[in-house]
């Protein structure tokens, strides 16, 4: 379980204050208007920024003083996920060893992950020779080989066309289900949330204003801000 317990952060006199609990195995879409605090929340969880007060716990253990590399998360962003001078094989391999000193079993893991996301035939190519969708598949494969129980996704597929975006979301959902991965994904697309998520967390005015099962993400929700967001998105 991931818990944000009265996590407060101030940026340019704007106060963000988050309370959120995510159960193991849930896929949670983090949604809300631009500037509401979605990426701030994700950055606090990842450890890129540190709260002024409050606690962040994973399975009961505080991680608030840990550096990003010490936290049990794999991360995937919209871009800048791959090293341009490394092959697909090595980019995936970084998920297992930062110095790429892989055992025979780990090399096999890399190949299996590439196979699962559909990039096995590109293992020896550089990222510049791949399409945008193929590059994101490689980045997803690197997440997959890491032993972390949770993925943090910050609009990783928003730049892709709708068909490819749907394909990638289905792949994330499938891989997460197979391994029991918990997913927290920022998205602006209501359709993406409903395609992949079991639950949602709606951020507005610097706080988590509403949470629930994904079927409750409708224009009939009690939150007026959420109602307006859903109507605008639809």
UniProtKB/Swiss-Prot annotation:
Gene3D superfamilies linked: P-loop containing nucleotide triphosphate hydrolases
Keywords: ATP-binding, Cell inner membrane, Cell membrane, Membrane, Nucleotide-binding, Translocase, Transport
EC number(s) reported in the record: 7.6.2.15
The protein's enzyme class: translocase
Major location (coarse): membrane
UniProt: ATP binding residues: 32-39
GO CC field: plasma membrane
GO molecular function, one term: ATP binding
Matching InterPro entries: AAA+_ATPase, ABC_SmlMolc_Importer, ABC_transporter-like_ATP-bd, ABC_transporter-like_CS, P-loop_NTPase, Thiamine_ABC_ThiQ
Membrane topology: Peripheral membrane protein
Localization terms from the record: Cell inner membrane
Catalytic activity: thiamine(out) + ATP + H2O = thiamine(in) + ADP + phosphate + H(+)
Residues of the ABC transporter domain: 2-230
Cell membrane keyword on record: yes
Role: Part of the ABC transporter complex ThiBPQ involved in thiamine import. Responsible for energy coupling to the transport system.
UniProt xrefs under PANTHER family: SPERMIDINE/PUTRESCINE IMPORT ATP-BINDING PROTEIN POTA (PTHR42781), THIAMINE IMPORT ATP-BINDING PROTEIN THIQ (PTHR42781:SF1)
NCBIfam families: PRK10771.1, thiQ
Family to which this protein belongs: Belongs to the ABC transporter superfamily. Thiamine importer (TC 3.A.1.19.1) family.
Record text on subunit structure and interactions: The complex is composed of two ATP-binding proteins (ThiQ), two transmembrane proteins (ThiP) and a solute-binding protein (ThiB).
Record-given protein name: Thiamine import ATP-binding protein ThiQ
Source species of the chain: Vibrio parahaemolyticus serotype O3:K6 (strain RIMD 2210633)
Taxonomic placement: Bacteria, Pseudomonadati, Pseudomonadota, Gammaproteobacteria, Vibrionales
């Amino acid at each position: 379980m991931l818990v944000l317990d009265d996590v407060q952060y101030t940026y340019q006199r704007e106060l963000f204050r988050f309370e959120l609990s995510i159960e193991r195995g849930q896929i949670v879409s983090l949604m809300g208007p631009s500037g509401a605090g979605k990426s701030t929340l994700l950055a606090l969880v990842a450890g890129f920024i540190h709260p002024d007060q409050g606690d962040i716990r994973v399975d009961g253990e505080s991680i608030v003083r840990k550096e990003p590399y010490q936290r049990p998360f794999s991360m995937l962003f919209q871009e800048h996920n791959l090293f341009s001078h490394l092959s697909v094989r090595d980019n995936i391999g970084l998920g297992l060893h930062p110095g790429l000193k892989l055992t025979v079993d780990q090399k096999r893991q890399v190949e299996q992950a590439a196979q699962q996301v559909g990039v096995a035939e590109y293992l020896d190519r550089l990222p510049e020779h791949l399409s945008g969708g193929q590059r994101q598949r490689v980045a997803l494969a690197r997440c997959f080989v890491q032993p972390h129980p949770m993925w943090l996704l910050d609009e990783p597929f928003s730049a892709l066309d709708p068909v490819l975006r749907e394909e990638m979301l289905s792949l994330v959902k499938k891989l997460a289900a197979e391994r029991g991965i918990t997913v927290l994904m920022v998205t602006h697309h209501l359709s993406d949330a409903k395609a992949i998520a079991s639950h949602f967390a709606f951020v507005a005015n610097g706080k988590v204003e509403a949470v629930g099962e994904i079927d409750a993400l409708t224009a009939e929700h009690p939150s007026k801000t959420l109602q307006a967001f859903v109507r605008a998105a639809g």
